[in-house]
Amino acid sequence: MDIDAEDATKSGLHPIELCVYSLLSGNLESIYQSINELRESQAVLILRLKQLRETCKDEQDRINKYCSLNAEIERLDKLETKVDVVLKRYEKMVGSISE
Protein backbone atom coordinates (compact mmCIF):
# COMPACT_ATOMS: atom_id res chain seq x y z
CA MET A 1 0.00 0.00 0.00
CA ASP A 2 1.59 3.24 -1.17
CA ILE A 3 0.56 6.12 1.02
CA ASP A 4 2.12 9.47 0.43
CA ALA A 5 2.76 11.23 3.74
CA GLU A 6 1.92 14.61 2.24
CA ASP A 7 -1.43 13.38 0.85
CA ALA A 8 -2.26 11.81 4.19
CA THR A 9 -1.54 14.96 6.13
CA LYS A 10 -3.46 17.06 3.61
CA SER A 11 -6.53 14.87 4.09
CA GLY A 12 -6.18 15.19 7.85
CA LEU A 13 -5.48 11.50 8.41
CA HIS A 14 -2.31 10.11 9.83
CA PRO A 15 -0.63 7.37 7.76
CA ILE A 16 -1.08 4.92 10.62
CA GLU A 17 -4.81 5.68 10.68
CA LEU A 18 -4.97 4.93 6.98
CA CYS A 19 -3.11 1.66 7.50
CA VAL A 20 -5.40 0.62 10.33
CA TYR A 21 -8.46 1.56 8.29
CA SER A 22 -7.25 -0.40 5.28
CA LEU A 23 -6.56 -3.43 7.48
CA LEU A 24 -9.91 -3.25 9.24
CA SER A 25 -12.13 -2.12 6.36
CA GLY A 26 -12.44 -5.65 4.99
CA ASN A 27 -13.34 -6.98 8.41
CA LEU A 28 -15.75 -4.12 9.01
CA GLU A 29 -17.45 -4.79 5.69
CA SER A 30 -17.84 -8.48 6.50
CA ILE A 31 -19.14 -7.61 9.97
CA TYR A 32 -21.64 -5.19 8.42
CA GLN A 33 -22.73 -7.87 5.95
CA SER A 34 -23.06 -10.43 8.76
CA ILE A 35 -25.19 -8.01 10.78
CA ASN A 36 -27.47 -7.46 7.78
CA GLU A 37 -27.78 -11.22 7.26
CA LEU A 38 -28.60 -11.66 10.94
CA ARG A 39 -31.30 -9.00 10.70
CA GLU A 40 -32.81 -10.71 7.68
CA SER A 41 -32.76 -14.12 9.34
CA GLN A 42 -34.20 -12.58 12.51
CA ALA A 43 -37.09 -11.16 10.47
CA VAL A 44 -37.71 -14.56 8.89
CA LEU A 45 -37.57 -16.25 12.31
CA ILE A 46 -40.00 -13.72 13.77
CA LEU A 47 -42.46 -14.37 10.93
CA ARG A 48 -42.11 -18.13 11.39
CA LEU A 49 -42.58 -17.77 15.14
CA LYS A 50 -45.79 -15.79 14.58
CA GLN A 51 -47.05 -18.51 12.23
CA LEU A 52 -46.25 -21.21 14.79
CA ARG A 53 -47.92 -19.19 17.55
CA GLU A 54 -51.08 -18.81 15.44
CA THR A 55 -51.05 -22.52 14.63
CA CYS A 56 -50.69 -23.40 18.32
CA LYS A 57 -53.48 -20.98 19.23
CA ASP A 58 -55.78 -22.53 16.61
CA GLU A 59 -54.96 -26.02 17.88
CA GLN A 60 -55.61 -24.93 21.47
CA ASP A 61 -58.96 -23.48 20.41
CA ARG A 62 -59.87 -26.80 18.76
CA ILE A 63 -58.84 -28.72 21.88
CA ASN A 64 -60.86 -26.38 24.10
CA LYS A 65 -63.86 -26.74 21.80
CA TYR A 66 -63.52 -30.53 21.85
CA CYS A 67 -63.22 -30.57 25.65
CA SER A 68 -66.33 -28.43 25.99
CA LEU A 69 -68.11 -30.83 23.62
CA ASN A 70 -67.02 -33.75 25.80
CA ALA A 71 -68.71 -32.12 28.79
CA GLU A 72 -71.90 -31.67 26.76
CA ILE A 73 -71.76 -35.27 25.53
CA GLU A 74 -71.41 -36.52 29.12
CA ARG A 75 -74.35 -34.35 30.14
CA LEU A 76 -76.44 -35.79 27.28
CA ASP A 77 -75.47 -39.34 28.27
CA LYS A 78 -76.67 -38.70 31.84
CA LEU A 79 -79.91 -37.24 30.54
CA GLU A 80 -80.37 -40.25 28.26
CA THR A 81 -79.90 -42.58 31.24
CA LYS A 82 -82.49 -40.62 33.24
CA VAL A 83 -84.95 -40.74 30.33
CA ASP A 84 -84.44 -44.52 30.06
CA VAL A 85 -85.22 -44.91 33.77
CA VAL A 86 -88.37 -42.78 33.42
CA LEU A 87 -89.49 -44.78 30.36
CA LYS A 88 -89.04 -48.07 32.23
CA ARG A 89 -91.14 -46.75 35.11
CA TYR A 90 -93.77 -45.56 32.68
CA GLU A 91 -93.87 -48.97 30.97
CA LYS A 92 -94.24 -50.66 34.37
CA MET A 93 -97.06 -48.29 35.28
CA VAL A 94 -98.84 -48.85 31.97
CA GLY A 95 -98.31 -52.61 32.31
CA SER A 96 -99.73 -52.68 35.84
CA ILE A 97 -102.76 -50.59 34.81
CA SER A 98 -103.58 -52.76 31.79
CA GLU A 99 -103.44 -55.98 33.81
Curated annotation (Swiss-Prot):
GO CC annotation terms, alphabetical? endosome
Top-level division of the source organism's lineage = Eukaryota
Q: What does this protein do?
A: Component of the biogenesis of lysosome-related organelles complex-1 (BLOC-1), a complex involved in endosomal cargo sorting.
Subunit structure of this entry?
A: Component of the biogenesis of lysosome-related organelles complex-1 (BLOC-1).
The protein depicted here goes by the name Biogenesis of lysosome-related organelles complex 1 subunit SNN1
Q: Which of UniProt's keywords are assigned here?
A: Coiled coil, Endosome, Transport
Q: Identify the taxonomic lineage of the organism of origin.
A: Eukaryota, Fungi, Dikarya, Ascomycota, Saccharomycotina
- On whether Transit peptide is a keyword of this UniProt record, the answer is no
